[in-house]
Amino acid sequence: MIFTPFLPPADLSVFQNVKGLQNDPEEWVAVSDATEDPSGGTGLPREPALLRGSWRSRFQRALACFTKCFRGGYRALGI
């Protein structure tokens, strides 16, 4: 069996449409942090706070949904 790793897409908004996802309070904080600009608009734009680690929780949830489909193994497929 060949295993190909799943890499999250560059556009992380794809995971927002997955059924059963709940918004974490940490994600709301990260969104509000990303929209505020403490420097008053001077200097370089900040990197969005969502890229710091919230994609991992979304990735783990998507991976859990994906592996749930294959828990029975080949016996469940009747092969």
From Swiss-Prot:
Family note: Belongs to the FAM236 family.
Protein name: Protein FAM236A
Organism: Homo sapiens
